[in-house]
């Protein structure tokens, strides 16, 4: 019996040792026994991956490379930035994403890859042991030397998209992979294309997002996990600081720059920007807080939207209270009202509201915090005007509205005059957030397939940045999110970073 227990213990230890987690990946290993051993190292300071690998190639009937991967089922999106280090020896050294049936060297796979000479392709082996052919077993991109690679599985279909910094994703091709099992390996890889030479590469902003069908309703059909992220808007580097299987939303950056504030389960929480355990903020009798909460420009007060039982259309009501917590003071009697901004002088709150007696449309209103009449600023008879936010100098209120047929960004003077459209593209653009230095507008863009009057959960969305002074928007992030991602102001006090929420499956009922 002792001998049997000893053997079982050794086998158990072997199984544990065989798994080598790195960052978000449960394992990394050489595939195909390359002559030169590879490695994957996770840098916690910036959440990047340093890859090193040998390997003759990923081609013909078998492969050699280094692989960091997870087992995953169902539909998913893989997105990352990639860079090969140095000039390299072989022009076909390669780095990218791979989805693989197994860790066998002849396994079926789908590989989205950029080579040392800039060649960018979707390559595949449809059956185990099949001999990969050129050009039959790859889809070519006319664009070369890309940095951002995305590979999506949608049922049996695989879609590859690419971009460089600032660009929207461009689809280069799609193909089916009927022979790949539901459970696959998915991860980042590196291959030197020369068995006698190691090569190195980097991957950052590495994201694996499990998706749900477009018909999924985030209120009705279950929620996905939430990730709280911080991003430098100028270099695009992202950091995940907090994760939860439940739903949290809409981070605000606290005035000291050291903490974030967000809502979850009807309550308000704060968390250090390095991560840690969230702390609940006392909001008194307001127990059903939604994702419309805003910190005053002087950093002393918090405005919130909280639901009142028995009131029309959900009863969302605007309140304010000390940022340190305390008893809320009600501002809006009529519902629904959804807060989006303080005035810079702290005397008014501006919000979107539906007033059925005036119009079925949602319009923008403002009201003094210490009492006074509600003032209507937009007068749309149909559709939606939402997300009003004062510029730091108090000269403009930025907002989004869909009277042109798509949701676009607008601005107006604080009295509602001088309305002018700012964006003119095919996306549905929501929630203009102005940097504290009054130089930049960060906002979220939904795809053309979304109803212009809706900003639902769990969609393929973009975060974009444009100058306040005018100019074309550029993409700063690709993510799976939407409602709750960036509904309210989320700039850091130094105007260099924003905070936002992204989502991933599986579904939690």
Model segments located where?
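Bacterial Sec-dependent N-terminal signal peptides
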Residues: 1-21
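Short secondary-structure capping/junction motifs at helix and strand boundaries
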Residues: 2-4, 19, 90, 327-330
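Detector for intrinsically disordered, low-structure N-terminal pre-sequences
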Residues: 9, 15-16, 30, 349, ...
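Extracellular glycan-recognition regions
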Residues: 19-217
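Sequence signature of WD/YWTD-type beta-propeller architectures
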Residues: 213-509
């Amino acid at each position: 019996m002792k001998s049997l227990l000893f053997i079982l213990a050794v086998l158990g230890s072997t199984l544990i040792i065989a798994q080598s987690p790195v960052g978000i990946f449960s394992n990394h290993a050489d595939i195909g026994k390359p002559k030169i051993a590879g490695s994957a190292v996770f840098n916690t300071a910036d959440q990047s991956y340093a890859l090193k690998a040998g390997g003759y190639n990923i081609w013909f009937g078998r492969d050699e490379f280094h692989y960091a991967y997870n087992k995953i089922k169902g539909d998913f999106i893989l997105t990352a930035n990639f860079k090969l280090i140095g000039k390299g020896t072989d022009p076909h050294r390669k780095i990218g994403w791979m989805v693989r049936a197994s860790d066998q060297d002849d396994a079926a796979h789908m590989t989205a890859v950029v080579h040392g000479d800039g060649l960018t392709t979707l390559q595949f082996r449809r059956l185990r042991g099949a001999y990969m052919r050129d050009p039959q077993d790859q889809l070519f991109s006319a664009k070369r030397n890309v940095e951002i690679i995305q590979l999506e599985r949608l049922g049996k279909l695989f879609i590859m998209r690419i971009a460089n910094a600032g660009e929207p994703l461009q689809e280069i091709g799609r193909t089916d992979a009927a022979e790949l099992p539901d459970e696959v390996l998915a991860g980042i890889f590196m291959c030197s294309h020369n068995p006698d030479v190691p090569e190195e590469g980097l991957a950052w902003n590495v994201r694996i997002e499990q998706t749900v069908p477009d018909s999924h309703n985030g209120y009705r059909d279950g929620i996905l996990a939430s990730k709280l992220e911080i991003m430098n808007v100028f270099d695009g580097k992202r950091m995940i600081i907090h994760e939860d299987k439940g739903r949290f939303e809409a981070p605000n950056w606290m005035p000291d720059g050291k903490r974030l504030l967000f809502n979850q389960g009807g309550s308000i929480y704060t968390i250090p920007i390095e991560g840690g355990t969230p702390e609940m903020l006392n909001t008194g009798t307001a127990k059903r807080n939604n994702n419309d909460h805003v910190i005053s420009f002087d950093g002393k007060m918090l405005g919130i939207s909280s639901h009142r039982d028995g009131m029309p259309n959900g009863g969302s009501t605007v309140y304010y209270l000390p940022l340190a917590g305390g008893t809320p003071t009600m501002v809006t009697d009529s519902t629904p009202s959804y807060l989006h901004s303080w005035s810079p002088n702290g005397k008014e709150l501006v919000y979107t509201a539906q007033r059925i007696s005036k119009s079925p449309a949602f319009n923008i209103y403002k009201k003094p915090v210490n009492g006074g009449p509600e003032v209507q600023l937009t007068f749309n008879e149909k559709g939606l005007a939402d997300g009003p936010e004062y510029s730091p100098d108090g000269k403009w209120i930025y907002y989004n509205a869909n009277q042109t047929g798509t949701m676009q960004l607008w601005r107006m003077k604080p009295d509602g005059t001088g309305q002018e459209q700012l964006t003119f593209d095919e996306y549905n653009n929501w929630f203009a957030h102005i940097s504290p230095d009054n130089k930049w507008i960060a906002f979220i863009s939904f795809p053309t397939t979304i109803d212009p009057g809706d900003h639902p959960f769990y969609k393929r969305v973009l975060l974009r940045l444009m100058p306040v002074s005018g100019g074309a928007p550029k993409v700063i992030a690709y993510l799976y999110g939407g409602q709750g991602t960036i509904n309210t102001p989320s700039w850091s006090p130094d105007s260099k970073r924003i905070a936002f929420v992204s989502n991933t499956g599986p579904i939690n009922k």
